Amino acid sequence: MVDGDGYTRDVAAMQVQNWKEQNLKVVFTNGVFDLLHVGHLKVLEAAATCGDRLVVAVNSDASVKRLKKGPNRPIHPQVHRARLLAAFRCVNAVVVFDEDTPLSLVQQFKPDVLVKGGDYEADCADSSDPRYVVGSKDVKLWGGQVVVVPLATGQSTTATVAKIRNS
């Protein structure tokens, strides 16, 4: 971590380049990561096993609101989400992004492996399909891999928020 919000985009890009120059395999994943739960951790741990260094991109607060997660989301501000993610041993770098998708980060970092959770499909080519992995076409073009890891059963931030609100 460089500051409370994670690496700046440029510093993260330099770090990724440094790792690549050391012939380390760079893995990239992204998400909101609000109300962290064991399902998030399992995806991150699985992602980390796909390479040597794991970069996690976190949606900014503004991005989360635009993604229609609800007017009261995220629960935790981006600085808290980034710091919590950076504390995991399996995570090597965290960067917050303000766009609706991480496509520009994927294109800038050029990871060797792009990882998403099991609600996505690695071979989905239709960018309008909710199962489409953003950046997958690019990663495959430069010879990288797209990996989808199984989700932990019964783990959902949205369901947890609903449960809390209804109790």
Range-by-range predicted roles:
Residues 1-167:
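Nucleotidyltransferase catalytic core that binds NTPs
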